[in-house]
Amino acid sequence: VGAQATENTMLKVGLKYGTNALFTARLQNYNDTLSGSGYEFGYYDADRSFVPLAATDEQRITVTVDSNAYVSGGVCYETRPTNYSTILGAYHIELLTAFGSYEEALAVAQSYPKGFVAYIDGEYRVRVGNHASYDESARVLSETDVLAYGAQIVTPSSTGVVVSVTDTDTV
């Protein structure tokens, strides 16, 4: 499905959630003639007002349910195919500190390899890595300096989604 907006028009994309939702959605915001690209993430409150949480300048993103996702030939699979190039693991290390803003959390996340910001229950959190198993997260945690914040391993969530740069394991 394609959509084209007129110049300087925002296109809103909603994602279905629940048991009948797709496992993954790939989005491309390609713009070679106009200024502006990327995505703004957020939600609609009870008054149907958009509440922004974060933004990215990436042109191609993939939104996946929070479970292990296997990338093969540019497609995300829920079950492991015979050959795959990348895995987006659903196990992460999460710092125990809540941050007051996306920018504050991002500054800390960028100090860790594969660090990223998560928005959990109204709080900005820093997560590190996207591992395929609890044991892999535990191994990485034992090798990661988190003394200033403390950390725990978090497992896949039935209500979470992961936004990654398409065809990579970058969250």
Regions found by a protein language model. Give the residues of each.
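Conserved, single-site charged/polar hotspot
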Residues: V1-V171
